[in-house]
């Protein structure tokens, strides 16, 4: 079945230690084989896979990129009078149409990170229970500005917020919000975690805060995967279904 209208936005590679197993190349190959138009990489607390990810996708898009480059050269030649043709305007329009068609066929690498968000400030490391805890948050770059802001957030999480894990906080997220899309994440996310603890008013507060900061770029994440492995934590699936019901209600 063609999966072109479905894209994975929460994905861990082998760079998510103890949580991801798949290599970047195999993930991309599988997504392409399934007819998907793109895939995100959102490793835990780091962006170590991104260079390998973008390089491999560029390699897979090599043929298409070559055609686009040739068409753009031809457009420039026609517009510069270096290539003669009966109807220059029509020829340029045809080339531009082909460029758009080819660009739509390119596989899209979506750069992201599943960050850890400190309940208080990222620099608070006093040994209190709150400082040892953290919430998961999927953060995606939707443009170049978002990519640079994501790099700043992740870098600062390591250099200033590290306490058991590299952490950011709400203040930093608001400071570097431009160009970012955020998702509420798995059961480790702030909203799901508060729902499972019965802290519904706190869960609503978190939703309202993220909505006020990120607007239409904030999404509540539903998860429906059921593990078939005997050793898996099957309680997590039932718990996620209960969380899903509440998330749908909030949305």
Predicted regions and their residues:
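Phosphodiester-processing cores and adjacent nucleic acid-binding clamps
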Residues: 1-251
């Amino acid at each position: 079945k063609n999966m072109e209208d479905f894209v994975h936005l929460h994905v861990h590679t082998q760079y998510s230690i103890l949580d991801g197993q798949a290599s970047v190349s195999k993930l991309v190959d599988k997504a392409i084989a399934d007819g998907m138009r793109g895939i995100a990489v959102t490793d835990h607390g780091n962006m170590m896979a991104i260079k390998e990810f973008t390089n491999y996708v560029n390699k897979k898009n090599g043929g298409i990129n070559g055609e686009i480059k040739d068409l753009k050269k031809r457009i420039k030649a026609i517009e510069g009078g270096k290539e003669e043709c009966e109807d220059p305007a029509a020829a340029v329009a045809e080339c531009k149409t082909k460029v758009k068609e080819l660009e739509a066929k390119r596989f899209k690498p979506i750069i992201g990170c599943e960050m850890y968000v400190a309940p208080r400030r990222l620099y608070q490391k006093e040994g209190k229970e709150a400082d040892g805890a953290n919430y998961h948050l999927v953060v995606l770059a939707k443009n170049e500005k978002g990519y640079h802001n994501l790099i700043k957030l992740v870098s600062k999480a390591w250099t200033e917020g590290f306490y058991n894990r590299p952490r950011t906080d709400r203040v930093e997220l608001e400071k570097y919000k431009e160009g970012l899309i955020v998702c509420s994440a798995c059961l480790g996310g702030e909203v799901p975690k508060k729902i499972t603890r019965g802290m519904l008013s706190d869960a609503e507060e978190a939703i309202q805060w993220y909505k006020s900061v990120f607007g239409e770029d904030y999404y509540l994440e539903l998860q429906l995967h059921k593990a078939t492995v005997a050793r898996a934590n099957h309680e997590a699936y039932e718990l996620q279904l209960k969380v899903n019901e509440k998330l749908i209600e909030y949305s």
